[in-house]
C-alpha cells in the first residue's frame, strides 16, 4: 500500500511519554509508532533509534531527546521521549519540548516509583495540562486484583498533585507484546491512542489567544509618534484597538494607531509576526524594552513568584560553585534582565550546579507574568539556570 501523503489538515498536538526509568517509556513510544505505521499513519521508528536520542542544545543546556511523529484517524502528533531522568527534568523546565499532554507509563509489575512521582509533580509545576495513564507490562501480572491495586495507587498519586485522578483514562497494556504483534496488546495501543485523541484537547492556537507582544525596541517617528517593535507572541492586534503597556512601571492604556511589517502598513499583526506598533499619545520615555503590549486585563504585573529551576552544570557553561538563599542574580524574562532575590525552600542549605529546585523569588521591578512563563537566570549575561514560573505569590 502506498504511503499516504501527510495530511496537514489534521489538528496538531504535542505529547510525550513520562514515568520512571525502565517502566517502558521508550518501548511504548516504539509500540505506538509500529502499531500506527501498520495502519499506514506513521513511518515506523524502532526502539534503538528512539533510545539513541541525539543530543540537543536548548538555551545552552544539553538534552537528549527523541522526536517522532505519527497520526491517528483524528490528529497529527509530535511525540517526545527522553532516555534519561535528568533529560526529562531539563526538558520540562526549559520547555524544550512543550507538551499539550503526556502519557504516564507505569509498570504494572512495579507500581508507582520515585520518578513516577517526580514526573507528575513536574508536570503540575510546568503546566502539562493533561495526563493519560498506560499500565505497561500488564502481561507480567497474573492477578487482576493486583492490577486494580496499582491502578488505584496511580490514580491517588495523580489526585495528590492536583490532577483529576478519578477521571483520567487508564489503559492496561504490554508494549513488548504490541511490538511482537500480539493482537490483544496491539488493540491496547490503539485504545491508548483513542484515549489520547479524546481526553487531551486540541490546544488553542496562538493566534486565538489574547494579544501579547514583548517590547524589544522603542523609536520615535517624527510627525507620527512612538513606535514599539517586537514579535507577537500570541493573538492579533488590529489598528484602532485599545491595548495596555504592562510591566516595570504602572500599567497604562493606549491605542494602536498603526501596524507596520517590513516597512509596509498593515491592518493587523498576528502571532509570529515581527511588527512595529504605533502608539497614540505615548511618549518614548514612557515605554521600554522588557514591558509588553497586551489585550487590556489579560495579564498583570508581579514581583513575587515560585519557580521550578534547573541549574546548569559547569560543563554546560554554568556556575562552578553552589548558591544559597540571598543569591541575587538577573532574571531574564522575554526581552530583559531584572534583578531578583532568591529564597531556597526550608531545609535546603544550598543548590549545586546540575540540581533542580523550587525557589521563591522577589524581583526589584514587576513584570507581566503568568504561570508557565519561562525565564533564564543570568550572571553578567551568562545563563546559569533555566526556569518556569510555577506559582505567582504577589
Curated annotation (Swiss-Prot):
Residues 10-204 form the tr-type G domain. Pfam families: GTP_EFTU, GTP_EFTU_D2, GTP_EFTU_D3. GO terms for biological process: translational elongation. Monomer. GO terms for cellular component: cytoplasm. Residues 81-84 are annotated as: G3. Residues 174-176 are annotated as: G5. This is Elongation factor Tu. Residues 136-139 are annotated as: G4. GO terms for molecular function: GTP binding; GTPase activity; translation elongation factor activity. It comes from the Bacteria. Mg(2+) binds at residue 26. Gene3D superfamilies: P-loop containing nucleotide triphosphate hydrolases, Translation factors. SUPFAM superfamilies: EF-Tu/eEF-1alpha/eIF2-gamma C-terminal domain, P-loop containing nucleoside triphosphate hydrolases, Translation proteins. It comes from Fusobacterium nucleatum subsp. nucleatum (strain ATCC 25586 / DSM 15643 / BCRC 10681 / CIP 101130 / JCM 8532 / KCTC 2640 / LMG 13131 / VPI 4355). Belongs to the TRAFAC class translation factor GTPase superfamily. Classic translation factor GTPase family. EF-Tu/EF-1A subfamily. Residues 19-26 are annotated as: G1. It catalyses: GTP + H2O = GDP + phosphate + H(+). InterPro entries: EF-Tu_GTP-bd, EF-Tu_GTPase, EFTu-like_2, EFTU_2, G_TR_CS, P-loop_NTPase, Small_GTP-bd, T_Tr_GTP-bd_dom. PROSITE patterns: G_TR_1, G_TR_2. GTP hydrolase that promotes the GTP-dependent binding of aminoacyl-tRNA to the A-site of ribosomes during protein biosynthesis. Residues 60-64 are annotated as: G2. Its EC number is 3.6.5.3. It is found in: Cytoplasm.
Amino acid at each position: 500500500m502506498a504511503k499516504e501523503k501527510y495530511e496537514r489538515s489534521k489538528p496538531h498536538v504535542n505529547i510525550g511519554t513520562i514515568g520512571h526509568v525502565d517502566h517502558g517509556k521508550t518501548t511504548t513510544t516504539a509500540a505506538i509508532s509500529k502499531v500506527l505505521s501498520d495502519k499506514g499513519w506513521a513511518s515506523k521508528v524502532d526502539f534503538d533509534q528512539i533510545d539513541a536520542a541525539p543530543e540537543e542544545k536548548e538555551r545552552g543546556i544539553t538534552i537528549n531527546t527523541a522526536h517522532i511523529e505519527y497520526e491517528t484517524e483524528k490528529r497529527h502528533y509530535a511525540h517526545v521521549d527522553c532516555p534519561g531522568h535528568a533529560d526529562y527534568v531539563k526538558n520540562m523546565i526549559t520547555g524544550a519540548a512543550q507538551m499539550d499532554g503526556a502519557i504516564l507509563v507505569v509498570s504494572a509489575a512495579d507500581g508507582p516509583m520515585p520518578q513516577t512521582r517526580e514526573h507528575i509533580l513536574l508536570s503540575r509545576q510546568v503546566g502539562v495540562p493533561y495526563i493519560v495513564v498506560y499500565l505497561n507490562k500488564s502481561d507480567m501480572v497474573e492477578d487482576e486484583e493486583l492490577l486494580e491495586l496499582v491502578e488505584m495507587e496511580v490514580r491517588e498519586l495523580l489526585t495528590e498533585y492536583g490532577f483529576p485522578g478519578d477521571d483520567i483514562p487508564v489503559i492496561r497494556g504490554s508494549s513488548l507484546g504490541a511490538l511482537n504483534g500480539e493482537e490483544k496488546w496491539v488493540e491496547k495501543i490503539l485504545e491508548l491512542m483513542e484515549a489520547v485523541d479524546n481526553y487531551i484537547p486540541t490546544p488553542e492556537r496562538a493566534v486565538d489567544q489574547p494579544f501579547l507582544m514583548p517590547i524589544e525596541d522603542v523609536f520615535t517617528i517624527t510627525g507620527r509618534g512612538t513606535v514599539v517593535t517586537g514579535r507577537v507572541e500570541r493573538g492579533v492586534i488590529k489598528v484602532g484597538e485599545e491595548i495596555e503597556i504592562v510591566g516595570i512601571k504602572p500599567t497604562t492604556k493606549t491605542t494602536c494607531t498603526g501596524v507596520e511589517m517590513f516597512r509596509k502598513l498593515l491592518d493587523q499583526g498576528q502571532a509570529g509576526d515581527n511588527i512595529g506598533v504605533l502608539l497614540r499619545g505615548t511618549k518614548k520615555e514612557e515605554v521600554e524594552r522588557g514591558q509588553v503590549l497586551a489585550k487590556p486585563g489579560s495579564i498583570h504585573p508581579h514581583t513575587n513568584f515560585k519557580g521550578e529551576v534547573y541549574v546548569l552544570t559547569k560543563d554546560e557553561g554554568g556556575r562552578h560553585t553552589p548558591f544559597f538563599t540571598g543569591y541575587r542574580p538577573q532574571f531574564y524574562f522575554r526581552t530583559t534582565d531584572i534583578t531578583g532575590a532568591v529564597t531556597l525552600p526550608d531545609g535546603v542549605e544550598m543548590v549545586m550546579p546540575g540540581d533542580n529546585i523550587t525557589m521563591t523569588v522577589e524581583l526589584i521591578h514587576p513584570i507581566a507574568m503568568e504561570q508557565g512563563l519561562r525565564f533564564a537566570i543570568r550572571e553578567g549575561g551568562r545563563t546559569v539556570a533555566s526556569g518556569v514560573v510555577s506559582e505567582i505569590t504577589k
